[in-house]
Amino acid sequence: MKSIILFVLSLLLILEKQAAVMGQKGGSKGQLPSGSSQFPHGQKGQHYFGQKDQQHTKSKGSFSIQHTYHVDINDHDWTRKSQQYDLNALHKATKSKQHLGGSQQLLNYKQEGRDHDKSKGHFHMIVIHHKGGQAHHGTQNPSQDQGNSPSGKGLSSQCSNTEKRLWVHGLSKEQASASGAQKGRTQGGSQSSYVLQTEELVVNKQQRETKNSHQNKGHYQNVVDVREEHSSKLQTSLHPAHQDRLQHGPKDIFTTQDELLVYNKNQHQTKNLSQDQEHGRKAHKISYPSSRTEERQLHHGEKSVQKDVSKGSISIQTEEKIHGKSQNQVTIHSQDQEHGHKENKISYQSSSTEERHLNCGEKGIQKGVSKGSISIQTEEQIHGKSQNQVRIPSQAQEYGHKENKISYQSSSTEERRLNSGEKDVQKGVSKGSISIQTEEKIHGKSQNQVTIPSQDQEHGHKENKMSYQSSSTEERRLNYGGKSTQKDVSQSSISFQIEKLVEGKSQIQTPNPNQDQWSGQNAKGKSGQSADSKQDLLSHEQKGRYKQESSESHNIVITEHEVAQDDHLTQQYNEDRNPIST
């Protein structure tokens, strides 16, 4: 390294003397020619041929100067380094060292560039591209003592927005930078040259994030632009609630987003893991539209009003009113896989609503209305003595050819009034899929947990239209010493109704898997409804009355268990032949 540096310095001194001689000749004659200056010189029997080209750009006040030097020697062991240095400070010190033959040293930043042309033995030198606020055109004579030469103020490297580029005509380049606030690029200067680009950027830690608007009363409106490649924001906190929302815009771009939204003092924390995999040919339109309006009022002895109208996505809402002893966690894994050819339109619209109350009086209410999606309900740690976690995977797989239209639509309107001695009125109107409803009014120390996985599999060819429609009207009155009235009107559905009366300190867990499979060819119109699962956990002296009117309902299972002082687990699987295991 030292020998190379000494060689470069000696070469610079020789070129400086030659430049001084040419400057004196230029001063006597007026000015050198503007295109290029050629000067042959000799050293130790070797012939050097120097050529300088200047190139000006006209974009944004920037300019580029290209210096190309051809060294016609046969000794390939010689290397030439071009070192760039602060030319303004050097120009103030002495004017005779403004242009040191195109090889410039940058002692502040310690940048080195090495150029080798292994094909013909020619060494190609550097280009410094200064991108500043002013356009400096430089001079055509490098040895003029006037301060406006290319080595003057135009090539200052003290500015923070200075961008220096090395334009290399050869095959390789080495550039070492010891500064973290400088940009180095290498680009090809001509059309037939090789382009090597190296760029180092120091940014103030900016990340691409989605837009989330949060208000005090629980109004949420999430707008996600899916043109971003990947958006990830992770925050760790000890808040006991989890909530997430994943929405896709109506574009053919699929994005996986992992977000944790942490609120202050509201005990909301969101986490979602969703994977949408679509394999197919000529999928013309795949849309995920969604809209949501929520209004929630949660007080100790007051009512809770919740309205949810959504058209698509996977949406989980969790609300807790906790006196410091409960923990709630919801995790959704959803996979929608579509394998098919020539699928013209596939749309998924779903909504899911969960509302939870965990007070000292132990009231917990959960309702999920979803369409082609997943509703997960979990309540954990009542009075600090129990903990439950439910993970519900749901897979909707559609295999088919030439499926023209598959639509899932749902709408939900909910109004709830939850008091200690008052009634509970709940109305749900939904159009098609899984409806999970759970209400708890517990005066003791019990816990209820409902898990319903659902799988919808559709296998068919040339399925023109598949629609799922259902309607349900519910009215419930849950009082301390009163009765429970439930009315369910459904069409072509599978309805599960379970009522359990627990007086003591029991814990009940009831998973209800439901599988609906449709298969056929040329199915023009199919209508059906998934399960509406309702569970009421009452205390002491409560009566249950169910009225169900359905045209094609089947597979009704009622299971009652009463266990005191222990945790009881009931697993109920409802399939085609209804096997029950406890």
UniProtKB/Swiss-Prot annotation:
Biased composition, class Basic and acidic residues, residue ranges: 292-310, 335-345, 413-426, 456-465, 533-552, 559-582
Signal sequence bounds: 1-23
GO biological process assignments: antibacterial humoral response; coagulation; negative regulation of flagellated sperm motility; positive regulation of serine-type endopeptidase activity; sperm capacitation
Originating gene: SEMG2
Regions of compositional bias (Polar residues) in chain numbering: 31-40, 137-160, 174-194, 325-334, 372-397, 445-455, 482-496, 506-532
Keywords for this protein: Glycoprotein, Repeat, Secreted, Signal
Chain residue ranges for the region called Repeat-rich region: 70-559
PANTHER family noted in UniProt: SEMENOGELIN-2, SEMENOGELIN/SEMINAL VESICLE SECRETORY PROTEIN
Sequence repeat intervals: 70-129, 141-200, 201-260, 501-559
The protein's name in its UniProt record: Semenogelin-2
Glycan attachment sites: N272
Positions of region (4 X 60 AA tandem repeats, type I): 261-500
